[in-house]
Amino acid sequence: MIVRLAAAQYATGCDVDENLDTALRMIDEAARAEPTVLVLPEFGNHLSIYDSAEHCWDVAIDLDSAWTRRIGAAAARHAMWIQFNCTVRREAGRVTNTNLLIDPSGRLTAANDKTVLMGAEGIYLSPADRPADVVDAGFARLGTYACMDGVVPEVPRTLAVRGANVLLNSLNSFALDEASTHIPVRAAENRAWLVACCKIGPLLPPDRLAEFAQNMGVPSAMLRGAGESQIVRPDGVVVAQGPRDDEAVVVADADLSLCGQPRPDGTDVRRNRRPAVYSGLAQPTPVADDHRRADRLQASATANVHEVASLVRNGSMLVVLPELALDDASIGTITAALAGTDAIVVSSRRHSSHDGTSHCGVAISASGVVLHQRQIHRVARHGWVDALGDSVVTLDTSFGRLAIVVGDDVLYPEIPRLAALAAVDVIAVPWASGGEPWDVELCLPERAAENRVNLVAAGPENVVVSLPADFTLWAPERRRPFDGTINLPDIARAHQTVTAEIHPVRSLNRRISRNTDLVDGRPWQLCQSLTD
């Protein structure tokens, strides 16, 4: 089935009535393209800055208000689904940031609150206290979320595992890495179409712009909506995208038969999930134990096992090889080459034991194999595997805590997340994937970013992903000028050997903004569907 999806990006201000008029104007403009579903930006009723709790309450809307009635009438007039986002008055004086979904009859069918509040949003707004509803629209199942809820993987994932195959994301962000990374990766990992609509124009009142720019360490000229609203295919390919700074209606026809399709090698990543392994995702973050973390070290990714000795001699403390690069002889050769060093070499091998044959990641030191990590998910190209792993195993090294994510396990956001919950500083990924463009373009950078871990992967391309020092907003002392991104790591990649510096100690800082932690702030209370 083909449906037309659309996003209408525009600017808003501090006049609630004027903002409603703008929304209605953009709905009418978008209706010319006759979309089935239209998404509007986040914080549609008012800029996300308030003078007081009373001010926040005053500019919020009620669920039965001019906003829902007039947008409902527009939805009925144009016979389309509309998602808009406003702050909403709730019981006991609470105000939430809420995605409101109107059906083509004009009826409000869902009011889903934002789960992960970003920075100053948490001063006056309350987070969601229940999982977002998935709405059966007949032609598709619609899942809604807002901005920061997509910078971490849990909220889109919970929607997808409950059947959503069209994801709707309203944003109010100045971050350029939303459009480049955090938005499209959620489509690909969940095999769903995605419509994302980001605001343009100033995100702050003019009289408070200088204050926020100084306190956040961000140039005032960059505190504008990033635009680039987009429609993303279930393989992570952006099929339509808006401009950076101008009003626009972004439209694309979506073939819903692409939802949930297997990967090129036949692997069904939705069916192959292992909920029983993910139990830690629905539990509080464990209290981190203290372990050594190096400030910096040299890491390499290479397809050539014969380069290992020279890479270690030249200073690499971690070398990652592609999957299945090892046998007994090469393990012995590598062990000998590491004599007198603290270096670690990672790859994988076939491993037979009493319960079957596994695809097993191994870490090798000067004393031999020091870590075994079985692949956790089935992969079609490895039909010989009949024994899977049931947990993420870690190794404390001289440079920090290491986990191996074997092969296509990295495609599942749950596994690197479990590594982060185990206070891992570096993830090694030996793989031979590359079946889809998003594997290297989106997946590897995002797994490092959303978990604040360094990542070294060897495969069709060799990739070293390092955490930057400048990360937390509201930290005005920066080592380098703000580049417009809020959570994009440093990436070195090539088809030949890659060597780059990584920083294990930087994994300690997961605070993306004031009061917003990428790992400790994850909505674990609402993640039961991930483990069912």
Summary of predicted features, one role per range:
Residues 257-293, 502-532:
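A short C-terminal boundary segment appended to hydrolase-like catalytic domains
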Residues 6-8, 135-138, 299:
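Ligand-binding pocket scaffold of soluble enzyme catalytic domains
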Residues 61-83, 150-249, 331-346, 411-499:
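CN hydrolase (nitrilase-like) catalytic-core segments centered on the catalytic cysteine
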Residues 16, 21-105, 109-111, 173-192, ...:
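Cys-nucleophile CN-hydrolase/nitrilase-fold catalytic domain and related Cys-dependent amidase chemistry
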Residues 61-63, 89-166, 171-185, 265-269, ...:
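Active-site catalytic loop in hydrolytic enzyme cores
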Residues 6, 100-102, 230, 250, ...:
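Conserved hydrophobic/aromatic positions in well-ordered beta-strands
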Residues 1-5:
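Extreme N-terminal starter segment of soluble prokaryotic enzymes
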Residues 9-14, 301-307:
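Short polar catalytic/cofactor-binding loops
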